[in-house]
Amino acid sequence: MIASGVWAECIPLSKAHNLKEVPTVASLPTAASAPETMKSALEKIHYLGDVPCSYKSTPLAAHFELHIEQGPHLISAGQRVGVVTAVQAYRWFRLKIIGRDTHTGTTAFEHRADALYAFAQMMVQAREVAAAKGCLASVGIIEVAPGSVNTVPGQVSFSLDIRGPETELVVEVEKELRSKFDKIAAAEGAGIGKPCRVEWTLDFDSPAVKFHEDCIDCVQQSAHAVVADAPVADTKALVRPIMSGAGHDSVFTSKRVPTSMIFVPCKDGLSHHPEEFSSADDCATGASVILQAVVRYDRKRFA
């Protein structure tokens, strides 16, 4: 989504170029190496071009995007095509819990400012609060310091991904979690322990997006045309209107031009996983749908 964000002028080019890789144990920088940036990675593979990336200098009439669903709905229902009508809202945060490093053998529970214990409670609260509002909350990165067997963790940094079908719901989840996290950090209701401090940093904010009706209509008509010869009693049931749970380039392009998306099934609904897979038939179906959708949209434009 970085390139589309730059193209839509929602992400400054300098910010995109300066994005740094998320370090892993295998990629931690040494004294002789700096973390890889987006710009250095593009240079390394000879992809750092000189063509301006902007909707003004390289305009589009519309944008159609083909993607695997990245979820289980199509594959579970035996459906062939998802007509994407919208993308849910999401916000990404980095949080830091600051407690105090102390010895595990000499510090009783009531004297500990245990950042990891506070984090454990926060993670449970995040899931419960999000679920109660029909949203999702996930932690994907956790860093614990100082990282010693016999030291109570004095600091925990973690990511928090909040998603929901409406922007307002995501805001409500965030507001409630801020309040609950403050109480957890203050050791209220825990019965034991000293206070910690929690800090929030917003990394990314993507409001809910509704796609263009003309583009949605073109995708829907094309999907029904492509599956019309399928050997089933009701081919209409093979096509499903769907909201995307994940962010895509279309989120940014939709801010500048009419946009919609096409989903095809993926095995077991898996994505961001080594076993991510879509069959050749499903890929061909998706390619046929996007081709017909583009043709239909052009006819509509010039009618």
What does each model-found stretch correspond to?
Residues 140-148, 159-165, 195-216, 245, ...:
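A short beta-alpha structural unit
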Residues 172-182:
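Short amphipathic alpha-helices in soluble, non-transmembrane regions
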Residues 9, 14, 163-167, 203-204, ...:
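Short beta-alpha connecting loops at secondary-structure transitions
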Residues 49-56, 106, 127-139, 149, ...:
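Flexible, glycine/charged-enriched surface loops at secondary-structure junctions
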Residues 117-121, 285-292:
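Short amphipathic alpha-helical face segments that pack within enzyme cores
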Residues 212-226, 230:
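Extended C-terminal subregions enriched in glycine
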Residues 2-168:
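Midchain, well-structured core segments that form catalytic/ion-binding scaffolds
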Residues 231-288, 297:
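Zn-dependent metallopeptidase/amidohydrolase metal-coordination segment
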